Amino acid sequence: MNIELLTPALGAEIDIDLGNITRQDAQAVYDALMAHQVVFFRNQTMTPEQHITLAGHFGEIDVPHPIYQNHPAIPAITVLENDADHPPDTNDWHKDLTFRESPPFMSILYAQKVPETGGDTLWANMALA
């Protein structure tokens, strides 16, 4: 596993196949997340079952999102569509699910279709802000 720091403030890229992650690999990913606030994994292919298994390595799976569409076979996976027919409903800085009594400790975003330009998702290190 190779971990590459992206900026001094936050972010690391990890070269690993998330579809076949081991407990030991998951611990290394968790440690990188704690050190760098956000981690990125390029060129991934995961089934919904692998996605939820990956999430389970990091703690209890959260309940389905109350507003957005959920995966038909695995309701704990939220399905977001952003295209001409489904424009994003927010363009503001936010943290996922902060309205809950116990917000989730992390989110896993698995982008399956990414535009050539635009469509950026940005992160900020609030500890350094």
Model-based region annotation:
Residues 2-129:
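Non-heme Fe(II) oxygenase catalytic core, chiefly the N-lobe of the double-stranded beta-helix
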